[in-house]
Amino acid sequence: LLYVFAAENELLRASALRELLAAEGLEVDVRERATGFRLAMDELVWEVRRVRASDLTRELGPRLRGAPAGVVTALRQVEVGFAIPPEPHGARVTIAIARLTGGLVHARGAWSRVSDAGLERVE
């Protein structure tokens, strides 16, 4: 289960993101950031930190359909922070995030490209 945290004014866009991740086979629960909800250490947190005015469904939809993750242009409209949970779900979630961000994920304070070998730091 992927928990998405968003400020009140970002909930609609976070819900659009939930629909896209659901299409990747990921169960998503959108929560308002101010709820004080606490997670177990092994659960993924995807926090929507900033979303620009563009609609996520319009921006992400066409890029997801049929495009290899590494070819999809990195989306500047969305900045996210997350922690990757342990297997078996960590790899699936990382791949789904990579599809949404053009093959790049932000983890442990750095951008990394997702490949078959794992995460490769991008300088």
Predicted segments — roles?
Residues 2-6:
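Short Lys/Arg-enriched alpha/beta "domain-start" segment
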Residues 12-85:
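Short, intrinsically disordered low-complexity segments
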Residues 1, 14-27, 85-123:
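Acidic, proline/glycine-rich low-complexity IDRs
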